[in-house]
Amino acid sequence: MKVYDVGRICVKTSGREAGLKCVIVDIIDDNFVLVTGPKSVSGVKRRRANIRHLEPLEYKISISKGASDEEVKAALEKAGLIEFMKEKVKPTVSTTFV
């Protein structure tokens, strides 16, 4: 089991979207993944993100690789995580990269 796999819910730890939750939609390579909020739910636009700037959470939803924002939103509603995704959290900075 990988930590950063499709459907994993994460918190962005850096940038203007720091503290917002997102869902991994696709794995680009060893260092980058494609994430989305979707924007209508948590405010995170679909974009490439470095895995060093993500903090994985224990939640995972069942979506296919490359799922659209509508499919991600439907999966979040099915799992009952819409309100959870709207909450902003204070990201913790890992000491391994400082």
UniProtKB/Swiss-Prot annotation:
Q: Which Gene3D superfamilies match?
A: 2.30.30.30
Keyword Methyltransferase in record:
no
Instruction: Give the InterPro entries listed for this entry.
Output: KOW, Rib_uL2_dom2, Ribosomal_eL14, Ribosomal_eL14_arc, Ribosomal_eL14_KOW, Translation_prot_SH3-like_sf
- Name any one GO molecular function: structural constituent of ribosome
Pfam families attached to this UniProt entry: KOW
Which keywords annotate this record? Ribonucleoprotein, Ribosomal protein
> Which CDD domains does the protein's record reference?
KOW_RPL14 (cd06088)
Mind telling me which SUPFAM superfamilies this protein's record contains?
Translation proteins SH3-like domain
| Entry's Gene Ontology BP terms | ribosomal large subunit biogenesis; translation
GO CC list: cytosolic large ribosomal subunit
The family assignment reads:
Belongs to the eukaryotic ribosomal protein eL14 family.
Q: Please give the name of this protein.
A: Large ribosomal subunit protein eL14
Q: Which organism is it from?
A: Thermofilum pendens (strain DSM 2475 / Hrk 5)
Q: What is the lineage of its organism?
A: Archaea, Thermoproteota, Thermoprotei, Thermofilales, Thermofilaceae
